[in-house]
A protein has these predicted regions:
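Active-site-facing substrate-recognition patch
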Residues: 2-95, 103-105, 109, 141-175
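Charged helix-capping and loop-helix junction motifs
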Residues: 111-117
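Hydrophobic "anchor" residues on beta-strands that sit immediately upstream
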Residues: 178-180
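Short connector loops at secondary-structure junctions
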Residues: 126-149
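Short amphipathic alpha-helical segments and helix-helix/interface helices
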Residues: 83, 119-123, 197-198
Length: 203
């Protein structure tokens, strides 16, 4: 696991009404488990790329055993990384939230939401963590960014400043909390995570 900084100055994002502005108003400390390599790595079992693709379960529909293997792999990763993040944060506890998928909550099959379910299960098993995995719920479709380039992003808009507030319900339970926000894949300049972080800060 590595630590880095999500920088406000690199979070320039389009505004819905035109122009650009920073999606994130302050720098944020972040962590990642491993680098994402493009190409055909998603086809290679046990890679981070394969794990992410399996949990999305949208390009290829995976059998239950493959999904179970992904759940077990992610569980192992989280049980190592989460306590280390808590230690490095210096906090007594962290509320764990999850970046929602791009489409509205009720448009996914249960087996497309195993990433969040796995994070929830591990969070409930570890000391020092509060389950906030359902604090951010998507109610309006946005474009699926990892499919948008191929023209298969579906209904909804690509990221703009304020898209999280416009398309998600955010629980008041996040107010005043130290939050660990988890996403399966962070892509600099896309600004999905930056906008969601700012929405939580504004709450």
């Amino acid at each position: 696991m590595e630590q880095f900084v999500i920088q406000s100055r690199t979070s320039l994002c389009r505004k819905r009404e035109g122009g650009v502005e920073k999606a994130l108003k302050q720098d944020i400390i972040a962590f990642y488990h491993g680098d994402y390599q493009g190409g055909g790595n998603w086809r290679v079992p046990s890679t981070i790329e394969n794990l992410i693709c399996t949990f999305k379960n949208d390009i290829t529909t995976y059998p239950q055993q493959t999904l179970n293997n992904a759940i077990n792999k992610l569980t192992q990763i989280l049980k190592v990384d989460l306590p280390e993040i808590l230690r490095l944060s210096g906090k007594q506890n962290l509320r764990v939230c999850v970046i929602p998928r791009s489409k509205r909550e009720n448009s996914y099959r249960c087996n497309q939401l195993y990433l969040r379910a796995t994070i929830q299960l591990v969070t409930q098993q570890l000391n020092g963590f509060i389950d906030g995995t359902h604090d951010i719920i998507r109610h309006t479709d946005t474009a699926t960014t990892h499919l948008a380039r191929s023209g298969h992003g579906g209904a909804g808009e690509l990221p703009y400043v304020g898209i999280t507030k416009d398309t998600c319900n955010i629980s008041d339970d996040v107010i005043g909390q130290d939050i660990l926000l988890i996403d399966d894949l962070y892509t600099k300049t896309v600004n999905i995570d930056e906008d969601c972080i700012q929405a939580l800060l504004d709450k």
